A protein has these predicted regions:
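Ligand-binding pockets and gating/stacking loops
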Residues: 1-205
Length: 205
């Protein structure tokens, strides 16, 4: 196969499409070969598993999210530049999630318990390993919830005009809050920025 590829390059000088495709396949192969080692959490010390909550047998969804947070740290350690995490809401079959049109208190109480310990442990772990100063952690959503109950339900409708996201690491100043909503928490009224600005900030950092 290598000889055929070399012959193609010789017969078609300047044609970089094949070389680019070969390089992409080789990169994909190397990535796949590294997955078993990266995803093997058996080498993690017991105190790390406890810190993240990965050993929480009473809350398997939380334990699963905790393992994903540990995996995220391991990926960052190996130079992966973008890692995305979900908090495990749909591991419950989608009934209990952040889309709180109904059962809002039940849903949010449960999912706050799922993400709180693992997320905090991830940030602390990155910091203790000297990785946080070069890693931007972003916690965000596509919209918030209205400050009043949805008609006929025990929940709240979508609110695209006022919600919270946070960042840490990568030189972010601690304790800084930017933007203010009105007195009801309904809409941003000061230092209002479109999502384009948010995305630009992430890319800049």
């Amino acid at each position: 196969l290598g000889q055929l590829n070399q012959r193609h390059l010789e017969e078609h000088p300047g044609d970089e499409k094949l070389a680019a495709r070969i390089a992409s396949y080789e990169l994909a192969a190397r990535m796949q070969l590294s997955v078993p080692e990266i995803s093997d959490l058996s080498t993690e010390p017991a105190h790390i598993l406890r810190a993240y909550g990965a050993d929480d047998t009473g809350n398997p969804i939380k334990a699963g999210f905790a393992r994903n947070c540990i995996l995220a740290r391991r990926l960052v350690e190996r130079g992966v530049r973008f890692v995305q995490l979900f908090n495990g809401a749909y591991a419950s079959g989608g009934e209990l999630n952040w889309d709180g049109h109904n059962k809002l208190k039940e849903q949010y109480d449960r999912h706050a318990g799922i993400l709180d310990q693992p997320a905090a442990a991830l940030i602390r772990d990155l910091g203790q390993r000297g990785l946080l100063e070069n890693t931007l952690v972003v916690w965000c959503t596509e919209f918030g919830r209205m400050p009043f109950f949805q008609k006929g339900a025990q929940g709240r409708d979508h609110n695209p005009d006022g919600f919270t996201s946070w960042m840490t690491g990568a030189g972010i100043r601690k304790g800084v809050s930017h933007g203010v909503t009105d007195e009801l928490g309904r809409a941003a009224v000061k230092d209002v920025h479109p999502l384009y600005d948010f995305n630009a900030t992430v890319l800049h950092l």
